[in-house]
Amino acid sequence: MATTYATGKRKTAIAKVWVKPGSGKISVNGVDLNTWLGGHEAIKLKVVQPLLVTKQETSMDIKATTLGGGYSAQAEALRHGISRALAAMDADFRALLKPKGLLTRDSRTVERKKYGRRKARRSPQFSKR
């Protein structure tokens, strides 16, 4: 099997992901996943979730680059990218990932600020008199 490329997105974060058969090494922005996360186990579980669902955690090598957003958004973009790459590799993986919602792009983004208001929805204090 050759290397499969996919992109994942979340908020303003973008992850470019290359997945190939291997020994289970995950490299993000040139460093190991654990180093990149700095010991955040909850976020690590989020990133490797597609591999756990498809039972491929020790048989796929992943190389990824992320940009934009924060750590959490980048991790979710990475999860989305890994899911899409696995689905492109094998149709059986798609059948496992789809019901878990891992192939769905989370479209929630920051609401824009409107004029005449302080923030997106917060308006100036109203005084009757």
Curated annotation (Swiss-Prot):
One of its GO terms (cellular component) is cytosolic small ribosomal subunit. One of its GO terms (biological process) is translation. Residues 107-129 are annotated as: Disordered. InterPro entries: Ribosomal_Su5_D2-typ_SF, Ribosomal_uS9, Ribosomal_uS9_bac/plastid, Ribosomal_uS9_CS, Ribsml_uS5_D2-typ_fold_subgr. It holds the Pfam family Ribosomal_S9. Residues 114-129 have a biased composition (Basic residues). It comes from the Bacteria. One of its GO terms (molecular function) is structural constituent of ribosome. Keywords: Ribonucleoprotein, Ribosomal protein. Belongs to the universal ribosomal protein uS9 family. This is Small ribosomal subunit protein uS9. It comes from Campylobacter jejuni subsp. jejuni serotype O:2 (strain ATCC 700819 / NCTC 11168). The gene is rpsI.
